[in-house]
């Protein structure tokens, strides 16, 4: 117990030292100034690489199950919409324009869509059909 009490303050300092405040949007870009505390222990590049790897794995699994991009018209519609949205990200994060944006449609009754770091997106058919 004594060891824990002595080590805890140092561990807390290490964690706090790895944090910084960042703006997630350009100040006042949409009438909002949003700050978040994030850790710098993992670089943005590492996060984006891991997200790309995870996204590729998810899409591969969906393809094996026959759930990936089954309806060419839906895929075309989603990609047209996302291609129109991507240029707008500069309002929030200028660096996001450089991401390798990708969007796919997953067959699911769920009403959902998501985006991973680095611009990896998925839209569920439930969102389109309902």
Please provide the spans of the model-predicted regions.
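Bacterial N-terminal signal peptides that target proteins for export
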Residues: 1-11
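C-terminal motif of bacterial Sec signal peptides marking the signal peptidase cleavage site
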Residues: 15-18
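Peri-catalytic and regulatory segments of divalent metal-dependent proteins
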Residues: 21-130
């Amino acid at each position: 117990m004594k060891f824990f009490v002595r080590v805890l303050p140092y561990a807390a300092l290490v964690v706090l030292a790895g944090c910084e405040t960042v703006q997630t949007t350009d100040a006042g870009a949409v009438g909002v100034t949003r700050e978040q505390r994030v850790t710098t222990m993992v670089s943005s590049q590492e996060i984006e690489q891991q997200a790309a790897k995870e996204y590729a794995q998810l899409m591969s699994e969906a393809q094996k199950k026959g759930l990936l991009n089954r309806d060419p018209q839906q895929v075309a519609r989603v990609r047209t919409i996302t291609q129109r949205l991507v240029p707008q990200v500069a309002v929030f994060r200028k660096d996001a324009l450089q991401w390798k944006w990708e969007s796919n449609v997953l067959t699911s009754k769920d009403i959902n869509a998501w985006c991973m770091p680095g611009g990896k997106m998925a839209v569920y058919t439930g969102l389109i059909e309902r």
